A protein has these predicted regions:
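Feature marking well-ordered beta-strand scaffolds used for ligand recognition
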Residues: 1-204
Length: 204
């Protein structure tokens, strides 16, 4: 994802949030690319990038910070959210939360919603340079949190599951109707309150 969060400001700069969902490049290819090495907090995982882009000179764009938005607030552990795996008997296996596939912003309300592999996340972006995680949701029927969409008023958010991936979609007649769907939440006092699921009943 790469979402324009604010701007251009009086200095002609815009702010973009970026997160990739591919594997981390080898350190031999790019020195600052460090994968999932236990105990190494320099990893490119478990964070998003805040990018500042001068509209008049985009070649001078730069990453201004890479906040660890999935960290445990008490221990500081980078992987503080869903660790991956299923949720118990007859539940979906959900990917680990270490990247965001989609971050959608609602600047006038100072909110962003992230579909972040293993969780749906609500962010306070009133300071665009310093996004803060304010709520997290899980779903035992989701495999990979794929997209987040606000309604026009910014009072609801729909999270969509990518069950099986684009090339292995599992919406066949024999697949479980309880797995993979749209999950609809109301935003109440900056918290996500689950309301319902929606899934197309017709198999592909």
């Amino acid at each position: 994802t790469h979402s324009v969060v604010s701007g251009p400001d009086q200095n002609g700069k815009i702010i973009v949030y970026n997160s990739g969902t591919q594997g981390v490049r080898d350190e031999e290819e790019m020195e600052e690319c460090i994968g999932n090495i236990p105990g190494d907090n320099r990893t490119a995982l478990f964070r998003i990038d805040v990018i500042e882009i001068p509209v008049a000179e985009p070649s001078k764009s730069r990453i201004v910070s890479s906040p660890t938005v999935f960290a445990d607030p008490e221990t500081g552990a980078l992987g503080g959210l869903w660790a991956g795996g299923d949720h118990g008997d007859d539940t979906q296996e959900t990917r680990r939360t270490d990247q965001c596939h989609d971050i959608t912003v609602f600047p006038s309300k100072g909110l962003a919603a992230g579909a972040c592999s293993g969780n749906g996340i609500l962010f306070d972006i009133s300071d665009p340079y310093n996004p803060q995680r304010i709520d997290v949701v899980t779903d035992i029927g989701f495999a990979y949190w794929h997209s987040a969409t606000f309604n026009n008023e910014g009072t609801k958010v729909i999270f969509t599951d990518e069950w099986g991936g684009g090339g292995r979609a599992r919406c066949r007649a024999w697949d479980s109707l309880d797995w993979g769907a749209n999950a609809i939440y109301d935003i109440v006092d900056n918290k996500s309150e689950f309301r319902s699921h929606y899934k197309m009943p017709a198999p592909q």
